[in-house]
């Protein structure tokens, strides 16, 4: 029985085994070799997940974990996003000790286990695995004062988040007497008078997830951590954990808490609206690019959360499309940011970039306009689908609010373009990409943004069919 279950966790076993073996090999092998082997481990894990792609839902180890098509696709996206981070680490030419890439593998192990969790026990344990590795990665650069400072801030606030989650789990178990997700679903579905304590437990768990997503008002750690950590770690923070927790949240809301939709819908509307306001007005006075994009990320999360709150097949499809395009845009963005030293990642260093590197300036401009939601770029269709879902489901005032705040947020995206094209250079910092591999990745992301409108209908249909097949419909 348990051997049959083992087949479904081969990706996780392979990944954690690879991490432990590489940790030992790091003593005798060159650190660059370890980074390459870490990347290969992630890609092999992608292949294993693809080979073991499970269409029908399978419960593993008496319901401790779950495997189905949705979870498998989510794992593949998480693993590929993580692979892009390690690829950028390799081609950036910057020195990182061998433990860095191994810690990323451990973090990814925690994240793909988290997305497959099917009980409160596996949920909390995998949540803590990824949290502990992220604590270490945040303050990995011992020589940088800001790195240590951001690591301490992240540790303290994340520990508080873990305490809130544990308290929520204890309340949820205390009132429902259930540990498995299916048991919790049955409890909420079959009881008309749901105890207030059980609802409070759910709210506390959602708060801890909002913290990891950097949704407002649980975003306090984001600007300092983005600025203080190395740029490659900032890229990891902005892409991989966010992707995981969006997929996880969608799964929990649809599989475990559909009967509480009226309760969590109001919470998510409030959190998403607060997020876009904090993003739009918080980013305006930022000059450090990593801090600026940390606030921008809060706004993007707000869009994804409001789309999740609507809870229909179309709105959930809009969330996934938004997430995928967000990942692509961030990969292109960090192709630029990774060229900076961590202390020189300043808006003023882009002055006159059009004259020094016109191709780079054009690529940045395309990515900024796409993030702002300017047609016909990819980012426009991501925001359009979210807003149209709001209108179709009667949330017209919220849709208008989001559109107006989105127009305000265009200010800081256009400010970057203005600095590149119209300000005279007074900095010795030369932003150029001499690495051909980085150039290729940057141009690829720009091409995706430019030609996405040709394929947008097909992408919508594929995602909608995928979600409908997995019973994510409203």
Curated annotation (Swiss-Prot):
UniProt GO cellular component terms: plasma membrane
Q: Which UniProt keywords apply?
A: Cell inner membrane, Cell membrane, Membrane, NAD, Quinone, Translocase, Transmembrane, Transmembrane helix, Transport, Ubiquinone
Its placement in the membrane is given as: Multi-pass membrane protein
Q: Name one GO biological process term.
A: ATP synthesis coupled electron transport
The protein's matches in InterPro entries, at most eight in alphabetical order, are given as:
NADH-Q_OxRdtase_suN/2, ND/Mrp_TM
Membrane-crossing residue ranges in chain numbering: 9-29, 33-53, 71-91, 100-120, 121-141, 154-174, 194-214, 230-250, 264-284, 292-312, 318-338, 360-380, 394-414, 439-459
Catalysed reaction(s) here are: a quinone + NADH + 5 H(+)(in) = a quinol + NAD(+) + 4 H(+)(out)
Primary localisation category: membrane
Molecular functions per Gene Ontology: NADH dehydrogenase (ubiquinone) activity; NADH:ubiquinone reductase (non-electrogenic) activity; quinone binding
> In its keyword annotation, does this UniProt entry include rRNA-binding?
no
Q: What is its EC number?
A: 7.1.1.-
Q: Where in the cell is it found?
A: Cell inner membrane
Any one Pfam family match given in the protein's UniProt record, by short name: Proton_antipo_M
What does this gene product do?
NDH-1 shuttles electrons from NADH, via FMN and iron-sulfur (Fe-S) centers, to quinones in the respiratory chain. The immediate electron acceptor for the enzyme in this species is believed to be ubiquinone. Couples the redox reaction to proton translocation (for every two electrons transferred, four hydrogen ions are translocated across the cytoplasmic membrane), and thus conserves the redox energy in a proton gradient.
- What family name appears in the similarity comment? Belongs to the complex I subunit 2 family.
Check the record and name the NCBIfam families matching this protein. Answer: NDH_I_N
State how it assembles: NDH-1 is composed of 14 different subunits. Subunits NuoA, H, J, K, L, M, N constitute the membrane sector of the complex.
- Stated name of the protein: NADH-quinone oxidoreductase subunit N
Q: Which organism is it from?
A: Ehrlichia canis (strain Jake)
Cite the source lineage: Bacteria, Pseudomonadati, Pseudomonadota, Alphaproteobacteria, Rickettsiales
């Amino acid at each position: 029985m348990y051997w049959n279950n083992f087949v479904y966790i081969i990706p996780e076993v392979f990944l954690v085994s690879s991490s432990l073996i590489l940790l030992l090999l790091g003593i005798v092998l060159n650190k660059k070799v370890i980074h390459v082997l870490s990347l290969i481990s992630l890609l092999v894990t992608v292949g294993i997940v693809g080979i073991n792609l499970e269409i029908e839902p399978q419960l593993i180890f008496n319901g401790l974990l779950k495997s189905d098509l949705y979870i498998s696709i989510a794992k593949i996206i998480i693993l590929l996003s993580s692979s892009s981070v390690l690829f950028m680490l390799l081609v950036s030419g910057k020195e990182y000790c061998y433990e860095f890439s191994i810690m990323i593998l451990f973090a990814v192990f925690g994240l793909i286990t988290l997305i497959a969790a099917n009980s409160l026990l596996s949920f909390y344990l995998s949540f803590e695995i990824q949290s502990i590795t992220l604590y270490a990665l945040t303050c990995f650069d011992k020589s940088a004062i800001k790195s240590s400072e951001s690591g301490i801030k992240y540790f303290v606030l994340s520990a508080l988040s873990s305490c809130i989650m544990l308290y929520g789990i204890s309340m949820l178990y205390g009132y429902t007497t259930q540990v498995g997700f299916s048991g919790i679903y049955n409890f909420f579905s079959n009881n008309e008078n749901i105890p207030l304590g059980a609802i409070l437990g759910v709210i506390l768990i959602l708060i801890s997830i909002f913290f990891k997503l950097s949704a407002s008002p649980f975003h306090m750690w984001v600007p300092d951590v983005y600025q203080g950590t190395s740029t490659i770690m900032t890229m990891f923070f902005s892409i991989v954990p966010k992707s995981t927790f969006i997929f996880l949240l969608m799964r929990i809301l649809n599989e475990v808490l559909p009967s509480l939709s009226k309760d969590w819908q109001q919470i998510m509307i409030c959190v998403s609206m607060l997020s876009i306001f904090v993003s739009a007005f918080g980013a305006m006075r930022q000059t450090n690019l990593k801090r600026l994009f940390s606030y921008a990320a809060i706004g993007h999360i707000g869009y994804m959360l409001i789309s999740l709150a609507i809870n229909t097949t179309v709105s959930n499809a809009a969330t996934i499309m938004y997430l995928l395009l967000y990942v692509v845009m961030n990969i292109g963005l960090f192709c630029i940011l990774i060229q900076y030293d961590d202390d020189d990642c300043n808006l003023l260093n882009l002055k006159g970039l059009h004259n020094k590197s016109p191709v780079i300036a054009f690529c940045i401009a395309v990515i900024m306009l796409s993030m702002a939601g300017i047609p016909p770029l990819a980012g426009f269709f991501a925001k359009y689908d979210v807003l149209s879902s709001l209108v179709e489901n009667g949330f017209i005032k919220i849709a208008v609010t989001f559109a107006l705040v989105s127009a305000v947020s265009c200010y800081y995206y256009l400010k970057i373009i203005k600095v590149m094209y119209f300000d005279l250079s007074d900095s010795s910092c030369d932003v150029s990409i001499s690495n051909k591999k980085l150039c290729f990745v940057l141009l690829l992301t720009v091409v995706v943004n430019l030609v996405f409108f040709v394929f947008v209908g097909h992408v919508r249909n594929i995602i909608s069919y995928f979600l409908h097949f997995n019973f994510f419909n409203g």
